[in-house]
From Swiss-Prot:
GO cellular component, one term: extracellular region
Source domain of life: Bacteria
Keyword set includes Secreted: yes
Entry PTM: Contains LL-lanthionine, DL-lanthionine, and DL-beta-methyllanthionine, when coepressed in E.coli with the flavecin synthetase FlvM2.
Organism (species): Ruminococcus flavefaciens
Name of the protein described by the UniProt record: Lantipeptide Flvbeta.h
Length: 65
């Protein structure tokens, strides 16, 4: 979660936590990316992320909007 702390200026960190917790992907999931959306007074913020379990730190996949 610390990785996404810079978004706190746009979305409260606890709301980002809630979005991740409601979109947990298991290690055997076939879902590649999760799209997270939050409505703020300034507009809708959309994040597309990949959640991977990387025991060897070999994750190279990146998601795109």
């Amino acid at each position: 979660m610390e990785r996404y702390g810079h978004l706190a200026g746009v979305i409260p960190v606890d709301e980002i936590d809630d979005m991740f917790e409601s979109n947990v992907i298991g290690g055997t999931s076939s879902i590649d990316c999760v799209r997270l959306a939050s409505n703020t007074p300034e507009g809708t913020v959309n994040l597309t992320v990949r959640i991977e379990f990387c025991p060897s730190a070999a994750c190279t996949y990146s998601c795109r909007l």
